[in-house]
Amino acid sequence: MTAARAAPRPGLVLVTGASGFVGRPLVAALARAGYVIRAASRRPQAAAVPSGVEWVRLPDLAGEVDWRPLLAGVSDVVHLASATHDEPGMGVEVYDRVTRGALVGLAEAAKAAGLRRLVLISSIRAQTGISSDAVVTEATPAQPTDPYGRSKLEAEAALRASGAPHVILRFVRIYGPGVKGHIATLMRLARSPWPLPFSSFRSRRSLLALENAISAVRFALDETAVAGETYVVADPDPLALPEIMAVLRAAIGRRPAVFPLPAPLLETLLRLSGRADLWQPLTQSLIVSPAKLLAAGWRPALDTRTGLAALMRAEQDRPAGT
């Protein structure tokens, strides 16, 4: 294992996409850890302002962006702002402008300004689709399957070609407070009193705790040895669907209560209920190995079982409407 070497501490860190699901807790965590933060968001007024954080408005990334004012006095950048894979009405051209085009301008401005490091938050979708028969590592040939993934891969290539000092982090699906999508659906199912037809499914999927995503960003900012590298980032322990449901239900004091159902029948039921989108994420494997990042010295803050259980309890206790 290669021992991690601490780089000089960043000065002023620009975080783009700072009011989103990852951005807001990232900004708060970095501020608590003593980083000086300039937080850029399309809706800065919508975010609570931690002490010592400067909030600025992020221009529309689909248009021309002058990055120089945002980079004034900045030593490092964490670039989270991007088109999301589930945003309605997103075409190939918009993905290209918002994800790749904006990154090209940012990388050029960062290099011209002599920035210390640009940490690009990318996605595992730059490397693979929503399932994979083999364990995914950084050495797995990149084969994105949709415009979102292709735009992420092209943004990564543009950053490397720019010559700007950088680290690229490819996150898998993140869970944490306020999570939406498939994880939120599983949590709703876990709260129901009914047995669920999941016990036959043994495919495993990698997830990423929000706390672990934040610790990976801090690692990318602080460590000398990771400069110029690309990492896939996931909790080390992928889980099968019955295991996830058991963890979620145990967290609120319930038995797993799962039973077998033939896969074709479950697929049909999902389609009839209008949730065909759940079929692959729930029943097909996507195992992502963070071995390279672990070998560099990153240590996740918590394991998947602990993280999912804590999230389930927190969401259970959350007052309605918050």
Predicted feature residues:
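N-terminal Rossmann NAD(P)H-binding glycine-rich loop of SDR-like oxidoreductase domains
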Residues: 12-33
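NAD(P)H-binding glycine-rich loop region in Rossmannoid oxidoreductase-like domains
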Residues: 57-101, 105, 109, 126-127
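Conserved Rossmann-fold NAD(P)-dependent oxidoreductase catalytic core, especially the SDR/UDP-sugar
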Residues: 104-147, 167
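Active-site Tyr-X1-5-Lys
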Residues: 143-167
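Substrate-positioning beta->alpha
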Residues: 150, 179-185, 199-222, 228-232
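Glycine-rich Rossmann NAD(P)(H)-binding loop
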Residues: 176, 198-204, 231-238, 247-253, ...
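Conserved C-terminal active-site "lid" loop/helix of NAD(P)H-dependent oxidoreductases
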Residues: 210, 246, 269-300, 306, ...
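Mid/C-terminal beta-alpha module of Rossmann-like enzyme folds, strongest
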Residues: 219-278, 309-322
